Amino acid sequence: MLTFTERLPPRHTASSPPPETVLFSLLLTAEERTRSRYRLDSPEGFSLCFRLPRGTILQDRDFLRGENGEIIQIIAKPEPVITITAPSTDLLLKAAYHLGNRHVALEINPDYLRLAPDSVLQAMLEGLGLAVNEEIAPFNPEIGAYQHYHDLEEAKKG
């Protein structure tokens, strides 16, 4: 079993691992990337165990280091989502406001919003005049205002 206990710095930093050191890439859904304690089997046949600091939320393209130095890359797995677009920025902002009031996991982009399928929310958004499309796509919801603080606290401990 390969046990992963450490998230490495993002790829754009000098301390990121070179691509040739990555054992394999692992596709995980948005929900799976929120689990800090997790066991699964990879498509390559490896038994994996995540023992990451509590509260860790993995992002697309993150790297993890195993107890024996193995490195894997996490990739956002395409999954069922609804993508919201609007004829105006104001209307898209209103949609983000209403979804935020409902504490919905939400991916925010300048041209669209993306969330997990929900028929009640879909009807509300369509009622507001937004275009709602069901699709299969990587889902990268915002991690929230306090995740950055959590990462800083973990760095201070390490």
Curated annotation (Swiss-Prot):
One of its GO terms (cellular component) is cytoplasm. GO terms for molecular function: nickel cation binding; unfolded protein binding. Disulfide bonds: none annotated. Signal peptide: none annotated. It comes from Microcystis aeruginosa (strain NIES-843 / IAM M-2473). It holds the Pfam family UreE_N. Its main location: cytoplasm. It comes from the Bacteria. InterPro entries: UreE, UreE_C_dom, UreE_N, UreE_N_sf. Belongs to the UreE family. GO terms for biological process: protein folding; protein-containing complex assembly; urea metabolic process. Involved in urease metallocenter assembly. Binds nickel. Probably functions as a nickel donor during metallocenter assembly. Keywords: Chaperone, Cytoplasm, Nickel, Nickel insertion. This is Urease accessory protein UreE. The keyword Cytoplasm applies. It is found in: Cytoplasm.
